[in-house]
Amino acid sequence: MNFSRERTITEIQNDYKEQVERQNQLKKRRRKGLYRRLTVFGALVFLTAIVLASSVWSQTSSLSAKEEKKEQLEKELKSLKTKQTDLKEEISKLKDEDYVTELARRDLFMSGDGEIIFNVEKKSK
């Protein structure tokens, strides 16, 4: 009784089955479109994140370089202000006639009336 028979079953063609198959195909197409849109959107978000990160990194490095230059210029400004105050003091001293004569005697070996200059070297120990 074991007969090997092939059973061929024909599918029933009705409107409901065709409608369900169309709905399934439509769902598959929509899902495939959704995956494509999400992939493109994800790629755009990723590229935007890379651009923003590189921009932030370059601005950070630029900012740190400018801060270093600012510190250097502030130090230079401080030294120039100190030099300016020293020069103002020197100008006020040069307006004093006694100071100018003392400088002339010390640096230029000038003498007053009736004075003789003796150059004595200091002994080093």
From Swiss-Prot:
GO terms for biological process: cell division. InterPro entries: DivIC (IPR039076), FtsL/DivIC (IPR007060). Required for vegetative and sporulation septum formation. Required for the activation of genes expressed under the control of the sporulation transcription factors sigma F and sigma E. PANTHER family: CELL DIVISION PROTEIN DIVIC (PTHR40027:SF1). This is Cell division protein DivIC. It comes from Bacillus subtilis (strain 168).
